[in-house]
Amino acid sequence: MALWGGRFQGETSALFKLFNDSLPVDYRLFEQDVVGSIAWADAIASVGIITATECSDLKKALNELLVEVKGDPAIILASGAEDIHSFVESALIAKVGDLGKKLHTGRSRNDQVATDLKLWCQSEGAALVARLQTLRSELIALAEREFDAVMPGYTHLQRAQPVTFGHWCLAYVEMIERDFSRLTDALKRANTCPLGSGALAGTAYQMDRHALALALNFASPTLNSLDSVSDRDHVVELCSTASISMMHLSRMAEDLIFFNTGEAGFISLSDEVTSGSSLMPQKKNPDALELIRGKTGRVYGSLVGILTTMKALPLAYNKDMQEDKEGLFDVVDSWAICLDMAALVLSGLVVNRPNALLAAQQGYANATELADYLVSKGMPFREAHHVVGVAVVAAIAKKIPLEGFTLAEFKTFADIIEDDVYPNLTIEACLAKRDVLGGTALTQVKQAIAAKKAG
């Protein structure tokens, strides 16, 4: 049953119905639509539109419908309804007859769907918050296990300075915490109830919208009916937050894919999150990480899609806004599975310490230490930088590490170099000197892990 029709004399085209109907997408709002309808029944009862008995009958029927659909979700799509609101109303009328036709009094699908969608965002958002917390915990646990595993740090994908794997893990903890902050902030802004805003001008019935908002666990009602029915900022913000978080997950995936290559060999991935080749028997591919990286693009696409849909819409509601859900649902599904998969990858990850240490000892990652040593002897840093650059060229030519030079050879670069240079060029010294807040010294990494565990 359509929720409109009296204005029309001709039949709706079958093609238009297929084009216009949103049930194949918005069926996911069923529970929110029923919950909102139960609250609305109380609201219209409070202003005398229905009696207390009628309200009780409506709520009983709606709760029965909720149980029935949870037992057999397929009945929604099998109904052929235009949208989830039409399905719920038709099913309600089938249960209670003409009483069901009273429920929509004072309500529009415009404020109804806006409320449903915010309720859905709140519910799914809470689950995403929990997933972010789980991933954060896995990163901290991995950082604690491997806090002192030495590996090369990179800039421009060139070996730069030694760091620890624990320090690397903590970098992504920082990113995940920012994702958590963005998501919780977005959910706070979405915690307002549009119900009672009508089609665009507000409902004609003097109900208590504050009570209605609280009944649906919103912090407060929205304050402008035009904005209430046309606002999709919560969709944009959730897609934006997901996009930033997926960017972080993709960067982490890229790092781990590289660390897992035969050329690097810093880590091994569990069989749980890898797959093989149909042709090459030796292959163990990091498919979980590659899919995280790949799904990031589709999340970005949905963000651009909703921004583009909304950018030129006049107030208030327009049918364009029906396109707000498919992308959002896909974003939330993609983000959720990627968060789960990232946590699973980390839980089974093993650091190959000898390989990672060997790589850190190569590539002249201690060159900065030699420059700092020269500075400690009184040489200006810019001059020291040049001297060490010359020394690196010479070391490359001789195929030796910097610490492979004899003292006499060192003195050809700068005669202020003494025997005490050698202790400064060890990996241990490189790490220990970064003993500053946020640094990679083992003392700092341990303190950071302790702080994260406490928080």
UniProtKB/Swiss-Prot annotation:
Entry annotated with the keyword rRNA-binding: no
Metabolic or biological pathway: Amino-acid biosynthesis; L-arginine biosynthesis; L-arginine from L-ornithine and carbamoyl phosphate: step 3/3
Localization of this protein: Cytoplasm
EC nos: 4.3.2.1
SUPFAM superfamilies xref list: L-aspartase-like
Keywords: Amino-acid biosynthesis, Arginine biosynthesis, Cytoplasm, Lyase
CDD domains (UniProt xref): Argininosuccinate_lyase (cd01359)
Annotated catalysed reactions: 2-(N(omega)-L-arginino)succinate = fumarate + L-arginine
GO molecular function, one term: argininosuccinate lyase activity
One Pfam family here: ASL_C2
GO biological process: arginine biosynthetic process via ornithine; L-arginine biosynthetic process
Gene Ontology CC terms, in alphabetical order: cytosol
The protein's enzyme class: lyase
Keyword Lyase: yes
NCBIfam families associated with the record: argH, PRK12308.1
Family: Belongs to the lyase 1 family. Argininosuccinate lyase subfamily.
Protein's name in the database: Argininosuccinate lyase
Organism phylogeny: Bacteria, Pseudomonadati, Pseudomonadota, Gammaproteobacteria, Alteromonadales
Gene name linked to the record: argH
